[in-house]
């Protein structure tokens, strides 16, 4: 009898956990669908709101560039920059625009520093990002101050030059992003592809290609692509393999 009771209790725990997981997935799917329909109801206008912003490699976007927004916090361990740099290098017709949604004072400080460094050296700024972002396989990113000192050397600038940029263009960019993302970006990283928000999606360069293709097809009214977009975002939100 005791053995049967333990088996029943074990079954009950498993069933409860399974039901809870199904309930969570249903709630996520419902939210993803509502967000997708809202995004699709808005006419996609590439580049609107991104005037004057530079691509990840430092270029200004061409007239027909494929605009990709990457919303991130530099306190987010899933907001690494390496795969995104690879994607930008492999697709010169794309323009990947970093947008900031800092979740803490430390994240704000890092975002401002990144944008200030970009004014002098794209390479130094990207190296700084990679150094200070928390790594999924390591709980200890490089100390902010040490990474910044190295960035001064990489960009061949003085602390005074950096400080001037910090309170000028960098502050304007980060403030504008924070305001634009309020109430729209709820998780990081979030990609915006053809005006569709892919929240909590940590894409590799190859996965980003596939996600962009799905977004393009969804915008043409392809129902299979629209369904798959929803599935990809749901899996991202649930911490599952996306593509």
Mark where each language-model region is.
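N-terminal targeting signals for export/organelle localization
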Residues: 2-50, 224-243
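General secretory precursor processing signal
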Residues: 58, 79-82, 204
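The N-terminal extracellular segments of secreted preproproteins, especially immediately downstream
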Residues: 4, 54, 75-78, 94, ...
